[in-house]
Amino acid sequence: MPRGSIILGVDLLPIRPIPNVKTLVHDITTDECRTALKREMQTWKADVVLCDGAPNVGTAYKKDAYEQNEIALHALRVATQHLKKGGTFVTKVYRSQDYNSLMWVIQQFFEEHQAVKPASSRSQSAEIFVVGRNYKAPDFIDSRMLEPKHAFQQNYDIEGAQKGLSIFHKKYEQHNKRHRQGYADDLGMSLSRVAKV
């Protein structure tokens, strides 16, 4: 990192002083945090936005996973406001019913994205990190994409009650599956392929 680079850290609790790091005590889901970040960033744009935040876990897995992915979505909102074009975004997520929806949203903002499981993360843990590279910096962003109630609305609420079926859910496939033998040959919709063995 070049000398003189600005590093900002945000947490709900005070962070012990780190040389050359400015820390803020805020909740990234609030307007107050966004205002404080804007004040600190002035007109600059970030090279990297990294979120390792996590909710208090231990109640129910569905609730924990929802809250973790909600934090990731809020971190993505911060990235869209402060990341430079071509920048990098890294966030912790939990594999859950919201995972594919979250990945779709991230894909809309980055040329490349991938899920990574660091060696330091326990293999039985559901946590992974998503890395988005080459931020597209779109001129217009539909704010609903960054709202958990819209991005995750077709999945489950945090108590686990079914609110609707996601297109990624197995029951959706069974529910909407057509019961027929296939498409007519003249439609060019055959799913078979002939190959020499």
Task: Give the location of each predicted region.
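Aromatic/acidic cage segments in peptide-binding pockets
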Residues: R3-S5, H26-D27, A65, N69, ...
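S-adenosyl-L-methionine
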Residues: R3-V57
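Short, ordered loop/turn segments at secondary-structure junctions
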Residues: L12-L13, I28, G53-A54, T88, ...
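Intrinsic disorder
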Residues: P17, D27-D31, E40, W44, ...
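Conserved Class I SAM-dependent methyltransferase catalytic core
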Residues: Y61, A65-A115
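Histidine/cysteine- and/or acidic
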Residues: L102, E111-A126, R133
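SAM/dcSAM-binding transferase cores
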Residues: S123-V197
